[in-house]
Amino acid sequence: SAASDVYKRQTDDRIVLPEEINGLPVVSAAPYAFSAHKDGEEDAETWESEDAFSFGEDRLLAGEEVQEIVFPDTLKEIGRYIFYGCKKLERLEFSDTLMQVGTGAFTGCSGLKELVIHQKKGIKSCAKEILGELWQKIDVDFLYENGEASGKRAHMVFPEHYDEAVENTPARILFTEYHGSGTNYRQCFYSKELDFAEYDSLFDMAVVMDKLEVLVDMSFGRLCHPWQLSKKAKKQYEDYIRGNLKDIGEFLVESGSLNGLELLSREKLWNREGLEHSIDVASGKKDMEISAFLMNERSRMQKEEQKVAGETENDGRPVKRRKKFQL
């Protein structure tokens, strides 16, 4: 049977549910379980974590108290409106055992930013059902732990999408204006499996509809974890980065993303203009660590240019041959 109506009382805002509670396997979570709008909460059983730390006040973790939840591998379904009103929920981690998602489960979860899915059985998941309830940008990490993909990771970014009514006053009409390419990206699932090729094929649309920081996350995520990334798609992301290197470099420096700058070096995506601009930005920001990294990259690039120039010069130089004399 399911331990489906158990709540956790502790002082941490991170909830890690066990596989068993009171000897019962945790296979489902009840409707409204973590919602601030639970019905009949006074009848619910309260589970207190053994590793909870008390600071003089226990809190029932629900509603805006919830920031991160880790579901056990045994969980198969979550009930309707389970996270209703959990505005501060940011991260959700679960396995591909979870396949059933109740209606409105993520209503009001405007702060959710990250899903981590442990693919223990195969490549199917409930990601599409969850993403379908969320309009904001969501990062999804698929961690493959079985079969030929075991040990692989895919970091997939699903952009935001929303529409708004815009008034054309002279014509006295309203029309709908759409923002973000997220609607299209959320349709890249078939039979609960993500179609990587279709996902990658939408990037040209994203370039037109989404912001620079989103495009950086998307392209860098695919290059850093290139599971199911074709040569054509890889070149597409690389071409975008090279074509916008000044803006991307500035964004990475301003946001303090040394990992992003290191990826540009590792994938050999720097050009002289983009690197020099990034150095100027880092200098103005007085970020010593990033400045040192970029200066080292400049030195490395100069050495490579000198090496290439030397090889070119040698290739163009006529070869001296010994003259033969007949005595």
Locate predicted features:
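Structural signature of tandem-repeat unit edges
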Residues: 1, 9-27, 39-77, 87-100, ...
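Conserved hydrophobic site in ankyrin repeats
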Residues: 263-264, 294
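Short, charge-rich amphipathic alpha-helical segments embedded
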Residues: 266-281
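Active-site loops and adjacent core secondary-structure elements that bind or stabilize anionic groups
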Residues: 6
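Charge-dense, extended regions
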Residues: 280-327
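C-terminal per-repeat helix/turn "cap" of leucine-rich repeat
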Residues: 33, 59, 81-82, 105
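Repeat-mediated protein-protein interaction surfaces in helical alpha-solenoids
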Residues: 221-237, 259-261
